[in-house]
Amino acid sequence: NGKTASTDHVRANMHQRIYLSTSGGSTWTQVGEASPDCAVGAAERPFAAARARRRQGASLEALVHAVLVGACRCIDPQRHQPCRIETLMGAIGLQRRLQAQQPRRCVAFGFTPWKQRNLRRFLAGSQLRFRAPWRRIPQGVDAVVVWGRRAKPRLLEAAARRQLPVLQVEDGFLRSVGLGADLVDPVSWVVDHQGVYYDATRPSDLETLLATQQWTSAQCQRAAALRQRLVQEAITKYNLQAEPWSRPAGQRRVVLVIGQVESDASIRYGAPGLRTNRALLEAVRAAEPQAYLVYKPHPDVVAGLCRAGAGEDAAAQLCDEVLPQGSIQQLFTQIDALHVLTSLAGFEALLRGLEVHCWGLPFYAGWGLTHDRERCGRRQRQLSLDELVHAALIDYPRYVSRDSGWFITAEQAIEELVAWRAAPPQRRTLVQALFRHWGRLRRR
């Protein structure tokens, strides 16, 4: 009737050989001769072959290999290219690990629309609600999220009464190509459950890691390779355009002094002594009277996005040269030492093996790697540079791909920053241009 094979046709083909398909059908393995007794119909032959295959038995390892390696075709979510199953499993595992570390239901206070969009990326997997700073904490939440140290005391007291953890979010140490004050999206943020890394008045997740964590030799080797890649690619926090500068001729010691935004929370909570750029310059000149002092003001101040510090306009009278433009990474190859209050530039200089003097208490001070003018009683441990790097760049931050929106590793973040910096510069959006203009007007 055209729907089933005739009996004569079945019997005529009873003695054909049966083969098994392996490796997705690319090769064939002979099983044996078909028996007339099993020839019930052509439609049953595939099932008979399957039963024959399964009677042969297989180890668990062979089964796993066949299902996950032989039968799967995997695509790297970052590079959009074929990859090994181990690469995909590692990427999926990273998403699950980071999402497991964060509360399920969060309410965030005081985030601008631009930061709200980025917070959704860095807390992917959590349910997020947003509130103005003066609003109350709603019911049915597991945690409160704030930006840095900007939370109102009333909000912190309300969270404490309800025993809700407060997560403090801040920029990571490998952030972007361009300034955050220009609304450039970050590759890295940190989410701290205790404090925040620049606040030396109390512990943070990073300080606890540095004080207690034990790193294996393999982890230290990974940190060393990461550090070498950073130096090789000249990666810094903002990765601004570099301008050539050469140290003056002669044997005079060249010292770089880093300016900061004086209203920054890192000075308020991390500099118990000196707190102004002018005071820092005066102290460094007194400490190094014979050195050639180079002063670099903060890029946000140079761009007009933040106010200059009190008396900072007199910096030229306290140093030998002021360098307002360009990336700091180019200067690292030309100097002998660097002095900071709490600037991240000191950490970047440590990565390059430079002598670093801290007049405040940045997160990298107090571990035996810097020359410190202040002391923190909680920091008693001596660390290697690679241990510091593993904690600060691998354990502590979160990295999110600008392309895929997935959580990524520090190594993958460096790849993205290198490609981002090499790409043609993009024009500012209308929102970015208006924000910059408004910032300049506000600070007049």
Regions found by a protein language model. Give the residues of each.
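Catalytic-core helical/loop segments in enzymes performing group transfer/polymerization on anionic/lipid-linked
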Residues: 1-444
